[in-house]
């Protein structure tokens, strides 16, 4: 099978790290409770049922909130924990700074395929090559957007993502 490769940045609509939990806490009329997703809350591609609860400023929520179909990956873990946040329903989750939240252009890429690729040995090797730093190698959004990834047809992506 001959698969095209694309610049990862070309299929990303939004990307970013989270903030420290203390950065969300504010005392005004816009504060609401939500869950805070940390690296330890991800196990074998699944988000824990009960993440810690914090209070956040709802005016700032959208920038850091996990949305349906977002791909979440770790920045420092050598094994790169990766998940696809399917249907979030009413669950409100914010990401910590040790995670990157990627909102994809779903017309171009299937989130489950991207999560499956990034979880594969080939994908982890690609992610490792995108990291920077001499002592603590960290994955940054800029480097990630510049990586090349294989992108089969949408039909093939869906087949792979469903496995």
Question: Positions of the model-derived regions?
Answer:
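Non-catalytic DNA-recognition/assembly elements of restriction-modification systems
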Residues: 1-21, 150-163
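Short coil/turn segments at secondary-structure boundaries
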Residues: 22-29, 130-131
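Membrane-cytosol interface segments
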Residues: 31-33
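A short beta-sheet element
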Residues: 38, 62-64, 68, 73-118
